[in-house]
Structures are given as C-alpha cells and as structure tokens.
Amino acid sequence: GGYMSAMPQKPEIQNEKPNATLEALLRGYVVASIGTRGRTLKDGEKFIGKAPAAIVDLKAAVRYLKFNDKFMPGDANKIISNGTSAGGAMSALLGTSANAKEYEPYLKELGAAKADDQIYAASIYCPVTNLEHEDEAYEWMFGDLDKFERIDFSSLDAASFNDRSKKPKMITGELNATQKELSRE
C-alpha cells in the first residue's frame, strides 16, 4: 500500500484464512506474484522507485510471462491483475495501458522481454487514484497532523446516511500520545 515497494506475496494462512495468493492456487489458478519498486526505494541517496517504476515493473513482468508462455503452465493471454488501494490503482493502470508507447523507453532501459503487455482483465479493489485527496490522508497518517474530524456513525441509519441534504453529525478530536507515536512510524 501507499505506493511503497512491494515484495512478491507468498501463499500462506493469514488470520486463520488463506491469503489471496493461496486462495487462487487452491482454486486451480496459476499465480505469478510480482515485486515492484516503490516511492521510498533508494539506491544510495537517489530515489529509484518513483513513478513510473511500479507500473514499468508490472508491465515487464507481463512481458516476461508472455515471452515465456510456452515454457510454463497456464495461458499468458489470460493474465488477470489484482490489487487493493495503491495496488488497485496499479491494477487499473495495467489493465488500461496495454502496449502504451509512453512506457517503452523505461521498459527498454529495464531490459524487458520483447512481448506485448496487454492483460486479459483487472481485478481492482478500492483503488487510490485521487492522489490530491490521498496526499491529505498521508499527511495525517504519516505526518505531523494530529487533529481530525470524522462522521459520527453511531447514530446513523441507512436512510439518514444517504440523505445528503443534511450535514451529518461530526466528531472532532486530537490524537493522543500513543496514536501520535504510531502515526509517525
């Protein structure tokens, strides 16, 4: 999440349930879990994970799978990307930017295989695509913003929540010392 570097996901049990990778394997899917560079990745003093690094890594992985299709199980023409939050945004971008020429210089520099990067489908969950709004959330979550305001859901039912003509009751507050320490990790 947060456009950070992503390690390939291992199939395992999390919170007494199979994670998405294990669930897919249990249902007979072929899974290729891809690691990507993220916004905080450095090589010495230089940031090397800034945009478009993550999407270039994903496109390179798709090209690798397609280039090697005859040597592996499954069908590389049926690749379905899956992601949540920043991963959802990456999945959406991967699904809508097939063979886009804008990425070619980056893919060439990376040494990506000579193949197309079109995928069959994208499975997208709560994609973070409005970065202007997300910047505010990151500032609060990862910065020095300690005051908050949120909707008081305790007295709302579905009808009152969906009635946009009335402003909902709000709760305002400030993080306590423990919460401040956690938000700065």
Where do the protein language model's features map onto the residues?
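Short, surface-exposed "cap/lid" segments of acyl-processing enzymes
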Residues: 1-23
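Serine-hydrolase catalytic-loop signature spanning alpha/beta hydrolases and amidase-signature enzymes
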Residues: 2-8, 31, 64, 71
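Glycine-rich "HGGG/HGxG" loop immediately N-terminal to the catalytic nucleophile
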Residues: 38-47, 133-134
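Non-catalytic, alpha-helical, charged scaffold/linker segments
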Residues: 125-127, 133-185
